[in-house]
Amino acid sequence: MEKTTKNGIHRIRQEGGKTIAWAEESGVKVLEKDGYYFKDLAKTGELLPYENWRLSDEERAADLAGRLSIEEIAGLMLYSPHQAVPPMPGGPFQGTFDGKTYLESGKEPYAISDQQKEFLEDEHIRHILLTNVESPEISAKWSNELQKRAETLPYGIPINLSSDPRNGAKDSGAEFKSGGSEISKWPEGVGFAACFDPEVAGQFAKDASREYRALGITTALGPQIDLCTEPRWMRFVDTLGEEVEMSKKLTKAYCDGMQTTEGEADGWGKDSVNTMVKHWPGGGTGETGRDAHYAFGQFAVYPTGNFEEHLKPFTEAAFHLDGPTDCASAVMPYYTVSYGVDKKNGKNVGNSYSEYLIKDLLRGKYEFKGIVCTDWGITQDPEKTIEGFGSRCYGVQDMTEAERCLLAITNGVDQFGGNSESGPIVEAYKIGCEKYGEKAMRERMELSAKRLLINIFHCGLFEDPYLDPEESAKIVGCEEFCRHGYEAQQKSIVLLKNSAKRAPEGQKGVLPLKKGLKVYIPERKIGPSKAFFRIDLPAKTEDPLPDGLPSKYGTRVASPEEADVALVFIESPACNPYSTEDLANGGNGYLPITLQYRPYTAKKAREVSIAGGDFRENFTNRSYLGKTNTAYNEADLDNILECRRAMGDKPVIVCATVNNPMVMHEFEAEADAIIAEFGVSRAAVLDVVFGGYNPTGRLPIQMPKDMDAVEEQSEDRALDMETYIDSEGHNYDYGYGMNYEGVLPAWKK
């Protein structure tokens, strides 16, 4: 047995028992029984079952759930809005300290804000979503401050911090992503699919779980396991691809790696992070690629009736893990209305409000016993305009917020993402008592409390929720984890084209480039655009290599005329799928989502949309047949074509950041080499360009022949698109890739 005290935290390490830790200022005492020590979290002077670490997590959670008031249970069922540490004024996630902004307050960056105190003390919230942090050390100190305050409150229930994915190598066109600080950097989700090696995803999960725990995070809001069978969806890059068998393998590797603590019989322990797989029952089938964050994209459709395949990453992987934890801890339903799926009740409502999808399928047929947590912001009253970025209570807008909460709870939902006020849940309980009886409602609320508490017990937080900030700083972004992440970035890069036309003597293709060349890299120009929150963004110019070209590769020059080679960085086309101007001019507001750069007119779109109907619209047909849209970043294509003209017989290399499949015929023939990457660092790309890494990645997607092929594929069907064949006869289909020697061997399942 070893007793230590550091930074006001007492810790007892017990041979044959659990390590316990408590804060001096919390007032918690220690109980001794049978030669072991236990925390007296309830401050009763006796060892209660939930305080006894010798009992199972299930027994402890059931005991504590039975002791909580309805108000306390309601607090557990909440999930805070996004929290930044520290919350900077002017940012999207603000906070105050004694009524002052952080900069005015003079507080330490790890201080608890007024709003966070209210979450904990008045609303009984114990689940908090962390976004940006100043540093790992600050995150650890902030986590400790939260846990200290929680330990002083009734029952001493610890905080379960969570995070969206935060290890992306760069902000790859995904504004809803959390920002990691000084953390290992990995490819985006579909980049793991491009590795065609589940062990890479498994290594990420193991490393990230260690980093998460060092930051205080015990729940990952991921992985995102939607089968992305619709190529225009804006969240395509975050998924694990569209091929179901690969997605299943990656899902298992990810969840097992995150949740498993080596050496623990049931897998749960100090290195474990709960996974919340999303989005049930699959969010990758939005009609024509529109996204359900917005009411204009609320409908998921299944034109070929392929609904069941989209469940498989959940039902055949996440719910049946190979590791000892057995099953992903939690599931998040998506915002979507899964249109026409509920044949039993005939209701088209948001997934969390669907009795068929949650109660009958998820809880019933597939027997999921973990937490069901809604996506963020679905219970409040809706926005007045269909373009507004507000509540997504699709199909239940005529209910009160409390009635919506009750409907979700009776379906089997345990938690409400982004909700920080317990009042509507308490009111839902009261309505439920009148409808179902007090005994039944109390049992239902306790069931959710038990599920939520089990995940906190799983991670050992009731015994020791405290971090050593100095150790956290050593773990997060350590050399080993950063190396693993960088290797994964390299493995995820796909070489699509490597023409021999301008290849140096002795090489089969133009790549790798010789070092010491003069390199021209044009700036990118992006036109006016819409941000994730539907805010208008002005046109901008950006340098794809703002820190310059490393001298070990060559010299960057100002014009094509001076250069030996042009290196053109582009991103896949992006556009605005909804226009208030079109609506004002008598249209329906809906525009085609284009995957090409030049203006696209939708000549083969559906005449009548599959889904439609919203109380803010006086029509149901969301078709955009005959309408035209243009990518914000059309100038990316101009850069390629202008470089080709100016470079004459000198090579042009294109490096594409691929957030969605792309129409390649606009520029492929003009490029000597094309590299596709899925959210990796520029350094990893330059390794492939200059011979530092012979590429091994394969396309985890299909590249369409043209936009007609995109319109003709089905939103719910994988690998059903006519693919592009390049000027050298290579088919840009799923599994295709090259290395410096030529085309990789054909991929086999």
Model-derived segments and their meaning:
Residues M1-K749:
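Glycoside hydrolase catalytic-domain context in secreted enzymes
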